């Protein structure tokens, strides 16, 4: 498997040109070797300093002929299992990569935000806390995140369990597990367990 993500201890996990290339590289690596991709996220969105061109005359954006940075992301979703974990604050571009997965889990101390409270205040003149904007309670209800984990270790175990149910790629079968459960067994409990709201 391939493991990637953002590290908050390095420039707040803010993506710059090199960081984005690394994210794309992990996706391309998973596609090349046809193995599951795991992303561990704890990072902010783009930094103002990262887009500042005063220090260099070189352009910071991609050339027009450069392939979209989301092509490899879309391809992984069609070819290999993608599991992600929010292990702290996740905002901006890292948040989009977090939710673009087959399985996502969020720890108690994590946040998933497109933008923070200051941006909301400026745009809508509404005071809101980070937790009310993007905490686990919000996203478990909205369907942005699949599961909740009390700790990082719990999140890792949930990812491990998820990966045990799926094949390594679209060209292989999942592992066959012996069971005493009857093939023709029906359970009415499933009618209530599966939410009618497709976003949950």
What are the functions of these language-model segments?
Residues 1, 7-12, 150-200:
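Intrinsically disordered, low-complexity segments enriched in small/flexible residues
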Residues 15-16:
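Conserved N-lobe beta3->alphaC-helix segment of eukaryotic protein kinase catalytic domains
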Residues 1-7, 22-53:
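A structural preference for short, pocket-lining loop segments at secondary-structure junctions
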Residues 35, 41-171:
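Conserved catalytic cores of soluble enzyme domains
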């Amino acid at each position: 498997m391939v493991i990637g993500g953002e590290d908050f201890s390095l420039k707040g996990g803010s993506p710059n040109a090199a960081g984005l290339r690394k994210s794309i590289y992990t996706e391309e690596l998973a596609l090349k070797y046809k193995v599951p991709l795991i992303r561990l996220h704890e990072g902010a969105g783009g930094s103002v300093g990262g887009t500042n061109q005063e220090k260099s005359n070189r352009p910071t954006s991609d050339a027009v002929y450069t392939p979209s940075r989301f092509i490899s992301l879309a391809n992984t979703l069609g070819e290999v299992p993608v599991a992600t974990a929010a292990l702290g604050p996740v905002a901006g571009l890292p948040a989009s990569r977090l939710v673009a997965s087959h399985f996502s889990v969020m720890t108690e101390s994590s946040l998933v935000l497109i933008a923070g409270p200051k941006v909301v205040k400026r745009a809508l003149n509404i005071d809101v806390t980070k937790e009310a904007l993007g905490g686990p309670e919000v996203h478990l209800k909205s369907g942005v995140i699949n599961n909740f984990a009390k700790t990082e270790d719990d999140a890792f175990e949930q990812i491990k369990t998820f990966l045990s149910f799926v094949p390594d790629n679209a060209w292989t079968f999942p592992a066959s597990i012996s069971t005493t459960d009857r093939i023709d067994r029906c359970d009415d409990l499933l009618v209530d367990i599966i939410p009618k709201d497709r976003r949950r």
